[in-house]
Every structure is written in structure tokens, then in C-alpha cells.
Design a protein with these regions (language model features):
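Short, conserved non-catalytic motifs in the polymerase core
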Residues: 29-37, 64-91, 105-117
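Amphipathic alpha-helical blocks
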Residues: 38-62
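Short, compositionally biased low-complexity segments
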Residues: 12-28, 61-69, 95-101, 131
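Non-catalytic, polymerase-adjacent accessory regions of viral genome-replication enzymes
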Residues: 1-47
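Carboxylate/His-rich catalytic cores and anion/metal-binding grooves
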Residues: 161
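Hydrophobic (often cysteine-bearing) scaffold residues that line and stabilize catalytic clefts
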Residues: 86-90, 122, 153-157, 166, ...
Length: 170
């Protein structure tokens, strides 16, 4: 696979890929009213997203903020979310289109938000490291970066993405 990937926008403009993005993006969100509305008429919304992409008239909405309680870490989190149509569908389309580019250079042990990897994958690695530890380590350091995504320089991120993706429309 080449180092840079192009023609992602054309890939996104395929109706089958749009339908796949709607189904994939709606997973675990069936309780949301806006998602149920889209799932009730998948073909109609597929055509609407297709028209937005073909005419290049998609304009992203401002994200809304909401506080949720995260049971796994036992703390409150402030999340930002966008409406499922059209923003959520287009976001999912972009991720599906760029996934091969990102996965190509990713370390095998990057587990977060990667299909087929996750908690079990990371746990298996940790158990293996502890079991085969030759030094006899006794301590573990668990760390978390506070508000990581807020600290990312967006201009630098876009510059880095431009080195991986050579599609100006994307």
C-alpha cells in the first residue's frame, strides 16, 4: 500500500459506502430519536447525503456539549456530539475511508477505537508481559492525560493528515 492515499472523496460518494456508514454509525445509538429517524428511511437519507457530497454543500454543525457519567472510570465526562444526520454520517464515512491509511502505520498494540482490538487485546498483552517478566517488577504505573483532545494543535493535526492523505476535497 502506498504511503499516501488519494481519491477518498470519490470513495465517500458511493451510495453503498454511505449506506454502510449509516448502519455502522448507528450501532449502539438506537435509543436516539435522530438515529431512529434515519434508520426508518435509510435509502432516502443515503440519497440526501449523496447529494450533499456531490454538490459539496455539506457544512458541519457546531457540536453540542453534554455531561455523562462514565462507569468504567467512575467519573463525570463532558462530551461533545453532533447530530447524526448529516454530520455523524459524514464523520463515519470519513473514518471508514481513511481507516486503511491510519491502520497501516499504527503500532500493533494501539488498542483504543480499533475494531478487533480493545480491552481484551490489551489485557492479554499485559498478562503476557507480567507472566514473562524476567526482572521481577513489582510496580505498575497507570496514567491518563487530562483533557488530551483539547490540547491537540488543530493546524498541526491537519498538516500531519495532509502528509497521509493527498485528496484536497477530503
Amino acid at each position: 500500500m502506498p504511503k499516501r492515499k488519494g481519491f477518498l472523496y470519490e470513495w465517500m460518494c458511493d451510495k453503498e459506502h454511505i449506506r454502510e456508514a449509516i448502519v455502522f454509525g448507528a450501532k449502539d445509538k438506537h435509543d436516539r430519536r435522530d438515529v431512529r429517524r434515519v434508520l426508518a428511511d435509510v435509502d432516502g437519507f443515503t440519497d440526501r447525503v449523496y447529494d450533499l457530497l456531490q454538490t459539496q454543500t455539506f457544512a458541519p454543525a457546531q457540536p453540542k456539549k453534554r455531561k455523562i457519567f462514565d462507569n468504567s472510570s467512575r467519573k463525570w465526562r463532558e462530551i461533545e456530539y453532533v447530530p447524526f444526520f448529516p454530520d455523524g454520517i459524514v464523520h463515519t464515512l470519513m473514518v471508514l475511508a481513511a481507516a486503511p491509511v491510519f491502520l497501516r502505520g499504527m503500532n500493533y498494540w494501539c488498542c483504543a477505537s480499533v475494531p478487533g482490538r480493545g480491552g481484551k487485546h490489551a489485557l492479554r498483552r499485559c498478562k503476557r508481559v507480567i507472566h514473562h517478566d524476567k526482572k521481577g517488577s513489582r510496580y505498575v504505573c497507570k496514567m491518563d492525560v487530562h483533557h488530551f483532545y483539547h490540547s491537540v494543535d488543530r493546524r498541526k493535526l491537519i498538516w500531519m493528515l495532509a502528509h497521509k492523505i493527498k485528496d484536497k476535497k477530503y
